[in-house]
Amino acid sequence: MAKVMFYGTGRRKNAIARVFAMPGEGRIIINNRPLSEYFGRKTLETIVRQPLDLTGTASRFDIMAKVQGGGISGQAGAIKLGIARALIQADPNLRPVLKKAGFLTRDPRMKERRKYGLKKARRAPQYSKR
């Protein structure tokens, strides 16, 4: 383990990510697997890398994340928030840049609960006139 580690927690939908940033060459490891192997989608990889690319710190830090719960999209969002928070611990001067881009805001949108009498949150059973 590295001597200096910066920590950030990210949440999105039902996913929770614990992110550790340490000085390194820019490797991103998620649940002990490389980023490209874990997600397999370029769009999700881009989402995870956004805070690093915006601040120009992609090659300065190695990122290690443990993420659980939710789906892959929620997990990517949780890791993104965790990375942004860890970067602020590493360098508080990055805060205005990340804040302006909206990377420090926890996305409050959650799955709406199912109501009785309906099939899903809003989907009503099929209606027959006759």
Swiss-Prot record:
InterPro entries: Ribosomal_Su5_D2-typ_SF (IPR020568), Ribosomal_uS9 (IPR000754), Ribosomal_uS9_bac/plastid (IPR023035), Ribosomal_uS9_CS (IPR020574), Ribsml_uS5_D2-typ_fold_subgr (IPR014721)
NCBIfam families: PRK00132.1
Cellular component annotations (GO), alphabetically ordered: cytosolic small ribosomal subunit
Pfam family of the protein (one): Ribosomal_S9
Name of protein: Small ribosomal subunit protein uS9
Record-level Gene Ontology MF annotations: RNA binding; structural constituent of ribosome
GO biological process: translation
HAMAP family on file: Ribosomal_uS9_B
Keywords for the protein's UniProt record, in alphabetical order: Ribonucleoprotein, Ribosomal protein
Annotated region described as Disordered, given as residue ranges: 105-130
Compositionally biased spans, kind Basic residues: 111-130
Superkingdom as given in the UniProt entry: Bacteria
Family label: Belongs to the universal ribosomal protein uS9 family.
